Amino acid sequence: MVPPLPLLLLLLLVPQGGHGCQGSELDREIVLAKVRALFLDALGPPAVTGEGGDPGVRRLPRRHALGGFARRGSEPEEEDVSQAILFPASGSRCEDEPAAGELAQEAEQGLFTYMFRPSQHMRSRQVTSAHLWFHTGLDRQGTAASNSSEPLLGLLALSSGGPMAVPVTLGQAPPCWAVLHLAASALPLLTHPVLVLLLRCPLCSCSARPEATPFLVAHTRARPPSGGERTRRSTPPLPWPWSPAALRLLQRPPEEPAAHANCHRAALNISFQELGWDRWIVHPRSFIFHYCHGGCGLSAPPDLPLPVPEVPPTPIQPLSLVPGAQPCCAALPGTMRPLRVRTTSDGGYSFKYEIVPNLLTQHCACI
């Protein structure tokens, strides 16, 4: 018996992507393969640019990159380094009052006291090198004439236990100046809120000129991450990004296992990165793909009224367009919704808005 023509037309309009005649569990790769086929059928293959011919390896310019300014994998990561110059705090110069008399007396003894206040930013970083510039007022001939068993310059740091020696080495410096490079063991001193240095120079005099003010130069870099932060940074990213729709999908109350055996609308969060098209389809980054899945048994749908006691239930027959045909869980004709996407074929210099029709299922039934 040949079915009427309207029934045949309606049968042809039923989407073939319902996945309803599969088993109780549907493999994710099967759904992804179906989604790829639907996109390629609607949009065609992505444009091939470059010698490689792989649209997945094209990179968007930084101004078009989604999710912030991501670094390219081929570029080395730039190290976070900085340089800071510290001048002595007030009261550490010869012209300051009332400390002028005390400093002049110390200068006669060849001892100069300077107080530095490292910033909070510097204290939060790792100091890699530091050197103190001090105006000695001595030319090279005077320095050579003062050579003796006692060193010309010595550096002390004031601590809770009293002054302690700071290991330093003399570096190259212009005339009338001395550069003292702090040893690595003394670098943690610059991570304290207050640093008091005592410089011993028997032949030096205290100068009140602004251009003779000593200063401290420090080079810093970001501290290496701790064990917990390193673990979090090394954790590989999720294969697909989170979205509000995916979060709502996870927050749904759990369903009975039997409900998944019957015909129902299933959902799957799919990202274009997972499909290998994140450089072709740039928006949205992910979407919830709804499809029909499950068997078409004779159990009553959950929205039907409960049976009356002592009254035999009436068997529920599934909707079938063709008499004698096996019903299949599929989307109702006319209820499919499209998906709007934004694509690029030149690495992000131009965009195209396209529509994938009949992609998202709204209602499922046994047909």
From Swiss-Prot:
Site (Cleavage): R63, H64, R233, S234
Signal peptide, first to last residue: 1-20
SUPFAM superfamilies: Cystine-knot cytokines
Major localization listed first in the record, in broad terms: secreted
Disulfide bond sites: C263-C329, C292-C364, C296-C366
MF terms (GO), sorted A to Z: cytokine activity; growth factor activity; hormone activity
Coiled coil (residue ranges): none
Post-translational modification: Proteolytic processing yields a number of bioactive forms, consisting either solely of the mature alpha chain, of the most N-terminal propeptide linked through a disulfide bond to the mature alpha chain, or of the entire proprotein.
Subcellular location: Secreted
GO CC term, one of those recorded: extracellular space
Residues listed as glycosylation sites in the UniProt record: N147, N269
Family according to the record: Belongs to the TGF-beta family.
Oligomer and partners: Dimeric, linked by one or more disulfide bonds. Activin B is a dimer of alpha and beta-B. Inhibin A is a dimer of alpha and beta-A. Inhibin B is a dimer of alpha and beta-B. Interacts with TGFBR3L; this interaction regulates female fertility.
Protein name: Inhibin alpha chain
